[in-house]
């Protein structure tokens, strides 16, 4: 072996949440670890998450909170490293935290405390952190991996790819992980923006006049199929790059419903409910909203209008809607979704539509506004307990680079911690 190579047991590419956790676990096992990060500082997504307070996990985390071409893949890693395990580490450092809602755990103070904790744990494990390591190139041999970078050349028996996805490119997101997967012949599920605002156009563009209006709703995407033309390469949403992607078979998606807030924006729809549903939405499919989540299914919103002698007109309709919806939203829905006529049957049809209002988004706001990237390295290429590539011993993929995407609320961080621990114990 050439003597000019810096030799380690493990090289981790990417000092985000997953890469840091993997380096911590491997280093504290006594492995010599080099952690290479192309940015000038580690953990940039950690620092901005949760409005700067880091929604670092969710108490109610389970496999059902994730989606993937293989919904069973995440089970092993999530079982091995649970939210309580990360919380034990947080409490050991005396970091104050609180549960905000729906099991979401946040720091009382700055997200910086989580990053500092992980960096201190890296130091305890003797991890060498190399920042501004750019121009990465990887060569494999029978004994390990040679990584060339702007900071020189490194060699290790094991290589862990924790380079994340394409979301929030201003933080330095790249497609390196997908390129490395393609280099080693691994399939990649086409990356797409997830937890992302949706854009309205055409006949629905008028909704943007309500920008700033929020309401409690139930949101869901209709079940559909992820379509990739037979024999064609799936396209990534980044400058037309394919990253060597292969066709993905048709796969039916289940409908998952989310009851949270929606927000009308200057371009379309956002808010937690819509962000959640966006991960399950595909172009050409409908997004459905129930504007009456507080009203029992058997309740009659327009009972008052149906009484003998009751006023039945647009004014009365607006008044009824304002009892359950914000005024601007109630007025708009009355204008565009009011009954065709004022018979009881027409009022009942109007209520049914309010419980299942169909939008047809023209797209998303893209990776620039997406909180995470869905898709990634096909889990069929990886060993579920270790994250090791089945066809390339010593090569591991973890975190957002893998086709496992969590729902909003700390689940993606828990996947980062869990997949990082799984690989860190195996390298």
Which residue ranges define each predicted feature?
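A glycine-rich dinucleotide-binding beta-alpha-beta segment and adjacent secondary-structure elements
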Residues: 131, 331-405
